[in-house]
Amino acid sequence: MSQASKWTALLATIRTPNIPSVACNVLTGSILASIAAPIQTPHAITAIASGVLLYLAGNLLNDWHDRDWDALHRPERALPQKFFQPSSYLTLAIACSLAGLATAAANPRSLAIAASILGLILIYTKSHKSSALAIIPMGLCRAFLPMLGYLACSDQAITPSLILIAAALLIHTCGLSLIARSESKPDRHPSRLFLYAYPLAVAITCLAAHINSTRSIIHLWPTALPYLLWTFLALFLLRRSAFTGVSMLLAGIPLVDWAFLIPFAKHPDASLPWLALCAPPIAFILGKSLQKIVPAT
C-alpha cells in the first residue's frame, strides 16, 4: 500500500469535507456574541479548535466502534483495508477528545458544552446502528457548536437567537441523517411531505430570530434562498443518487449559518460587519471542493 493511499483513507475517516462546516457553526456562535461586544479572536479560535477536535474524535471513535460492520458493508474504509491498527484509531480518538476539552477549558461554560458534545458523541457511537433515534444526539452535536462559540466569547446569558440557530442546525442535521439512513433501506423512504417540510422548517427557524414589528417573514425570506435552493436541488438529485444528494446536504450546512447571519448585517443598527458573512460561503465552497478528494460520508 502507498503512503498516499493511507493518507487518503485517513482523510476519509475524519470526514475531511465536513470540517469547514464544523468550524463555521462554531464561528457563527462567536459572531453572534460579537454583536453585543467586540469579538474576542483568541477565544473564537480556541472554540473552533475545540469543535473540530471533538468532531475528529467522533469520526475516529465511530470507525473504530463500527470496524466489524464496515468489514462487511464498507470494505473500502481504512480499518477493513488494514491500513491502520484499530488501537491507533482509539488512541487518536481519546487524544482528540482530551485536546478538545482542554482547548475549551479556559471558560467553564464552554467546557460544559464541549463535555456535553463528547457525551453525545459516545451515545451516538453506541446506538446509531441499532436505533433511528440516534439522529437526535447527532443533531444535538451540531446544535451545540454555535453555543460553544458563543459561550467561549461572551459572558452573557444564552439568547433566543442562539437557541434558534441551534434549533435550525438540529433540524437540518436530523433531517439529512434520517434521509441518509432511509437511503440504505429502500423500503423506508421518508415521505415527500417531510422532504419539503424540513428545509422550510430550518429556514423559518433561522429567520424567526429577526422577526419584529418592522420586519416580517415576507421581508426576510430572500435571505434563506441560497439554503433553500441548494437543499431542494439536493433532494431532487437524491432520487438519482443517494450519495450525491446526501453529500450535497452535508455541504449545505454552512448555508444554514448564512441564512441566520445575513439579516443581522442588513439591520439598520447592525454591528455585524459584512466581512463576517464571507465565512459561510467560503466554508460551503471549501467543503464541496474537498468532496472531490474524499467522501463526506
For each feature predicted by the language model, list its residue ranges.
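Multi-pass membrane catalytic core of lipid/isoprenoid biosynthesis enzymes
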Residues: A49-S50, R67-I121, G139, S161-A167, ...
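Divalent metal-coordination and catalytic microenvironments
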Residues: I14, D66, W258
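Select subsegments of transmembrane alpha-helices in polytopic membrane proteins
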Residues: A12-S21, Q85-I94, L133, P137-M138, ...
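C-terminal membrane-associated helical module and adjoining short loops/tails
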Residues: S2-T8, A143, L151-T297
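Membrane-embedded alpha-helical segments that form the functional core of polytopic membrane enzymes
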Residues: V22-H65, H73, S97-A104, R109-Y124, ...
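Membrane-interface helix-loop-helix junctions at boundaries between adjacent transmembrane segments
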Residues: I123-I135
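N-terminal, positively charged, Ser/Thr/Ala/Gly-biased leader segments
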Residues: S2-L27
